[in-house]
Amino acid sequence: MANPLLLDIVLYLQSVNLVEGDGVDAFRDFTPDMPDQVVLLKEYVGSPAVPYDTMVNRSVQIKVRSKYADTARALALQIYKALYSDTTIVNFTSERWGQVHLRQPPFKVEVDKNDRILYGFNIGVSTTIE
């Protein structure tokens, strides 16, 4: 069985040196209190599967949190650019590729209760169901 999509995205970000690793500074469907600087990935409602296509359209929000707005924005922009491809195809791992649709550039999402700033963006990923 394949890895979950969010884990494959984290592994890809690790391979391009934008995160240290899953559960270190990148978290899936979980927001830890510490460390201050983290990358957060969450999958939300995508589009329904169609009977004639083996691919499904999934939606992912990627957020970067930091004590410094410039740092959060810069890392969010680096991740955004790492997911950009002229063909829209990104090879997350040797077992998973996806057609990535960048829905908007990074924007300021919120300031949390500890005055840390979050920048984020949303992507659509056409990939396998697993």
Task: Name every feature range the model reports, one short phrase each.
Residues 38, 59-61, 118-122:
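Broad gene-expression machinery/nucleic-acid interaction feature
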Residues 1-52, 74, 86-95:
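Small/polar-rich, solvent-exposed N-terminal microdomains that initiate assembly or binding
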Residues 53-66:
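Short glycine-rich, basic-tinged beta-strand/loop micro-motifs
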Residues 66-89:
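Mid-chain, well-packed structural core segment of small domains
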Residues 27, 42, 63, 124-126:
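Residues in well-ordered beta-strands of folded domains
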